[in-house]
Amino acid sequence: MSDSSITMALDMKKGRIRIHKNTLHILGDPQYIQILVNDATMQLALKCIDKPCSGDQCHKTNAKNLDADESCEFYSFALVSKLRELIKEIDAKHTYRLTNGKHVKSHGIALFELSSIEKVES
């Protein structure tokens, strides 16, 4: 099921990943999020996990403690670099948004089509 409120932002210049609070709520306020990229299907997934895992794409969320208008932010130049390899049109100086993520409840993930990435106009 696709949901327009499942969104995230990617700041290519700062290497910042911002997951909107509502996205975390839809995912059940997970303690940790693992960010996965599938090159073959051109998809990005946010996977809910209960314990920290190895690797630089696993992040603590503190989702339940966020204020109403806050987002959860992580920094990962490795992820940003990977996305720039996959999506040639991405400009390293801009911020992009992934919207209409699909909540796959049975797998505890939010799934985004990388083809739907949109540049955020300043």
Pin down the residues of each PLM region.
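Mature exported/compartmentalized surface modules and terminal targeting/interaction regions
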Residues: 39-40, 45-122
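Glycine-rich loop/turn
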Residues: 1-14
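Short, well-structured hydrophobic secondary-structure segments
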Residues: 18-20, 25-51
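Short solvent-exposed loop/turn micro-motifs enriched in small/polar/acidic residues
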Residues: 1-3, 28, 96
